[in-house]
Amino acid sequence: MIKAGILGGGQLGRMLLQAAANYPVETFVMENDAECPAAHLCHHFTKGDITNYEDVFNFGKGLDVVTIEIENVNEEALQKLEDEGVKIFPKPAALKIIKNKISQKEFYKKIEVPSGNFVVTTSKSELHEHSGFIPAVHKIAQ
């Protein structure tokens, strides 16, 4: 039986577990909240911090595959797990790109994925300089 871990136990984690119920998969979830939506559907629940290197590494080292249900996870620990043979989805390199919204938008532009125009600002004065860039959505990079 495949041992599959999910980092994060929110609604997406719960939906992943519901789909996994149709397959020969032993499920593991790590989340800081023991009452999260996914906690009671998995075979094994671990209370832990998905942003903490040691928690993520220790959670994943005995598993066959690890995935995420939220992007705010420790990608360094995921990279170490992948280096040691655990299958990680999405790949830690991809996660590093999608975690930072500036990197994500620049990557989309580079590979010509249709995406809205954007301006990167790093200060209040730069934000004022681009006040005519409307409509706009303002996001923190990471």
Roles of regions detected by a PLM:
Residues M1-K99, S103:
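ATP-binding N-terminal substructure of ATP-dependent carboxylate-amine bond-forming enzymes
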Residues L95-Q142:
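Active-site nucleotide/adenylate-binding loops and adjacent lid/helix of ATP-dependent enzymes
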